[in-house]
Amino acid sequence: MVDKDNAITEGQNAERLLKDPLLIKSYEVIQNDIFQQWIRTEMEESDKRESLYFSLRGVLTAQNVLVNTVENGKIVENELRGGK
């Protein structure tokens, strides 16, 4: 039960983070900065573009971890309430 309670709590915390205006703005600024750097690269700077791509993937992965944590918490909470 502790693991399920923990999953619910983590899900609620992740949801709070995803709704936090500062975190939302931070993700937007980081993603925009990466994109702006990417579009300013020269044709021969493929290594730089690749590095920027992986940076963006890292940011998106962090967001996805939070989204998945929210969803997992909701699933566990629904199960405990007798839902399907």
Please annotate each region the language model reported.
Residues L56-K84:
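Charged low-complexity stretches with an acidic bias
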Residues V2-R40, V76:
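N-terminal acidic leader/helix
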Residues M1-V2, D20, E45, V59:
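Short, structured coil/loop segments at alpha-helix boundaries
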Residues K25-V65:
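Amphipathic, hydrophobic secondary-structure cores in small proteins
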